[in-house]
Amino acid sequence: MTDYDPRIVALYDDDNPDGPDHAYVRRLADEVGARSIIDVGCGTGILTVTLASSGRRVVGVDPSAAMLAYARRRPEGDSVEWIHGDSRNIPPGRFDLAVMTSNVAQHIPDPQWQRTLVDIHRALRDGGVLVFESRNPAVRAWETWVSSEPTTRQTAHGALREWTEIELLGCGVVRLIAHNVFEDSGNHVVESETLVFRDREAIEEQLHEAGFTVDAVHGDWDGSAFTENSRLVIVRARRG
């Protein structure tokens, strides 16, 4: 993959702050008594470091070297094992909990997605829990992402002008193209990501094929039931 510009990485936590998704995961970790946790697609580690506590092993895996460099520099960064890679690089062991937040699941294309589920299933102990979310394709969130006009904000590197474009690549597949112009230097950074929107039925089928049992499907981080109009598909599944 083409890695992220470090100047954009430095803005990630402001754009994706700690919120109800992270609170949900922390509650779940306590609920299941997790002593070992794997955060797949951990990014800057904003959630990962909050899961680490005395006697608990926490591992963060991400394919972005720039994201991991930021994560390692966190004051609490030495409390986590950081691994550059994807699900194939999950270390041996029987984890109690695996998490994927910030719609990480949508960044993994087929068939790598099915392999990812199999890899996570293998890494969990019997009864170990997997939780992740994906945007509900029925809501068509991508239609709200196109910027009618560029916006500008101040950063540590000066004024940053931003706008977004999308391309529909097929059923449930969207390319998000983010333009970032650092006005002081004129440097134009373009970051492109392909997102896969999977519906509830497809997600459950893929989990079953990987050996998981689906315990719950929520439509929001407050634990409310999933409906066809829910913004998210939040899945809690277990090995065995």
What are these language model-derived features?
Residues I46-N89:
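Class I SAM-dependent methyltransferase SAM/SAH-binding core
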Residues R198-G240:
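C-terminal lobe and adjacent flexible extensions of AdoMet/dcAdoMet transferase-like proteins
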Residues M1-R35:
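Conserved class I S-adenosyl-L-methionine
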